[in-house]
């Protein structure tokens, strides 16, 4: 789009590195005011600088935000400065805004590649700011949400399906909620605390899923916050089963153990998910359902596990029974340098057996 003389003048004004506050009223009159601050343009890299994005947003991203906000003045301005109007169309969630984008040259059909490019650009940035921005741009925005969910739904669905046995819980997840869950998982796994807090605060109806994710990703302090402060409750043995879905989830498994979860059930879950470190951890915590566990292992053709369970060499680890309350700091300290005595017993047996 060929820029007007007016937009060119605004570009020069926005490119000034430092403007005294006396100029602020001029910037407001010129439409160079956004989020209670002047719009600043880095012409070398074509970045829009905002108070909550000090490192700057590229023009296409700024255009997407303006389109989501139905800000026609900025949509036109950013397009004249060089942004691709098709990116604005991605986030145009009202008919008048879509029509305005068409007037500025947007394609009538949504470009799926551009949608996925921007989505993964935000997600892979792995900062709280970008995760929150990604969610705000695409959530409750049926056109791009539909495209994104079609691309990620299959892998995400089976990822979630592994965590919960209640299929009704999955069936009730809307496309918007699935997108929210995906963004939350990225934030939680990468310890993006600002983004995690954002989801906790704004999406209370997904609290059960927040608890499930904390269990699965071994996030002890999040689990304690959700369980004790938010009072989110599901069956304690189901909590333990979810914690057992990933290997080395000792922190969340121990938390469930202290709350009273059946450690023999956890032993069977460790076999079900073929997680050997979890299995030895359960034995250290006193699990003794060896016959049932062997039968399950043989049923699944896990003969190496069955052999390990047939050995009469295991004993609980007394050091793991010192805590009586689910205190996350104490649990973290207790398990910080944890080494499985049961695994050591098996390795010693295996070494002696092969050398004799």
Curated annotation (Swiss-Prot):
Membrane keyword on record: yes
Main location: host cell
Keywords, comma-separated and alphabetical: ANK repeat, Glycoprotein, Host membrane, Membrane, Transmembrane, Transmembrane helix
Top-level taxon of the source organism: Viruses
GO biological process, any: taxis
Keyword Transmembrane: yes
InterPro entries with a match to the protein in the record: Ankyrin_rpt, Ankyrin_rpt-contain_sf, ASFV_MGF360
Glycosylation sites: 125, 352
A GO CC term attached to the entry: host cell membrane
Mode of membrane association: Multi-pass membrane protein
Cellular location(s): Host membrane
Residues that span the membrane, as ranges: 206-228, 249-271
UniProt ANK repeat ranges: 58-90
Pfam families: Ank (PF00023), ASFV_360 (PF01671)
Protein task: Plays a role in virus cell tropism, and may be required for efficient virus replication in macrophages.
Family recorded in the similarity comment: Belongs to the asfivirus MGF 360 family.
Name listed for the protein in its UniProt record: Protein MGF 360-10L
Source organism per UniProt: African swine fever virus (isolate Pig/Kenya/KEN-50/1950)
